[in-house]
C-alpha cells in the first residue's frame, strides 16, 4: 500500500478552494452519519448518489462527489485532495481549480453512469481529475510516500511513477474484475479528464508553460535526442 503524504513542490500562495472542499465533504459526511442514526439513510442513496434509488439525475453527478461510504473512504480521498489539490490550485488559480474539480467530478460520474450504471458515491472521481492534471503540470515533482510492504518505510517517488501506478492498478482491477466496490471507471474517467484539460491549457497558452511541466520535459528530451 502506498499513501501519499506530501510533495516537494513549494506552495506560492495560500490554498482556499482545497481546504474548503475538504470541509464541505467532512460536513456532508457528518450529516450522512446523523441521518443514518435517525433511520433516514435512504434519503442520500435515493436523492444524491449517481444512479441512486430513484435512478439517474443530472444534478447527482455533482452531489455524489461530496458524499462517502465510511470514514476510511472519506479520509483517503481527502488526503489525496490535500496532497495533489494544493499544488494544482496554486498553478491554475482558485477559480480554475474549482472548475476543474467540479467538472472532473461530473465527467467521472457520467463515465460511471455510461459504463457501469450502478450507484456511485465519493470524491475519488473529482480527485482523480486533479491528480491527472497534476501529472501534466508536475510530472517530475517528488511525492513523499508512506510504503506498507512487510515493513513500513518512507520514500520519495516521482509523480509520474506514483500516479502511473494508481492508473495502472485501476486498469488492471477493472479488466480482471477484482475492483470490488471501487468505481474504477469513475477514477479512469477522472484521470483522463484532468490530464486532457491540463494538456489543453498548456498547449493553448491559457496557462504559461514552466520548466517542469510535461511540455517542457518533452522539449528537453527532444533536444537531447538531437545532440546525440
For the regions a protein language model found, what residue spans apply to each?
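A detector for small-residue-rich transmembrane helices and their helix-helix packing motifs
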Residues: 1-228
Amino acid at each position: 500500500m502506498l499513501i501519499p503524504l506530501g510533495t516537494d513542490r513549494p506552495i506560492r500562495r495560500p490554498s482556499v478552494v482545497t481546504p474548503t472542499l475538504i470541509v464541505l465533504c467532512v460536513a456532508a459526511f457528518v450529516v450522512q452519519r446523523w441521518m443514518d442514526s435517525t433511520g433516514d439513510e435512504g434519503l442520500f442513496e435515493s436523492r444524491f448518489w449517481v444512479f441512486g434509488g430513484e435512478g439517474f439525475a443530472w444534478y447527482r453527478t455533482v452531489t455524489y462527489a461530496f458524499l462517502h461510504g465510511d470514514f476510511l473512504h472519506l479520509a483517503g480521498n481527502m488526503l489525496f485532495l490535500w496532497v495533489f489539490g494544493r499544488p494544482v490550485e496554486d498553478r491554475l488559480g482558485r477559480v480554475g481549480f474549482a472548475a476543474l474539480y467540479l467538472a472532473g467530478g461530473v465527467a467521472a460520474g457520467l463515465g460511471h453512469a455510461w459504463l457501469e450504471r450502478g450507484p456511485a458515491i465519493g470524491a475519488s472521481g473529482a480527485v482523480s481529475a486533479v491528480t491527472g492534471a497534476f501529472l501534466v503540470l508536475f510530472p517530475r515533482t517528488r511525492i513523499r510516500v508512506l510504503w506498507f510492504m512487510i515493513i513500513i518505510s518512507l520514500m520519495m517517488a516521482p509523480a509520474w511513477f506514483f500516479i502511473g501506478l494508481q492508473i495502472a492498478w485501476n486498469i488492471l482491477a477493472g479488466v480482471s474484475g477484482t475492483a470490488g466496490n471501487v468505481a474504477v471507471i469513475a477514477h479512469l474517467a477522472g484521470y483522463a479528464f484532468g490530464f486532457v484539460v491540463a494538456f489543453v491549457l498548456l498547449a493553448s497558452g491559457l496557462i504559461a508553460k514552466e520548466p517542469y511541466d510535461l511540455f517542457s520535459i518533452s522539449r528537453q528530451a527532444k533536444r537531447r535526442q538531437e545532440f546525440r
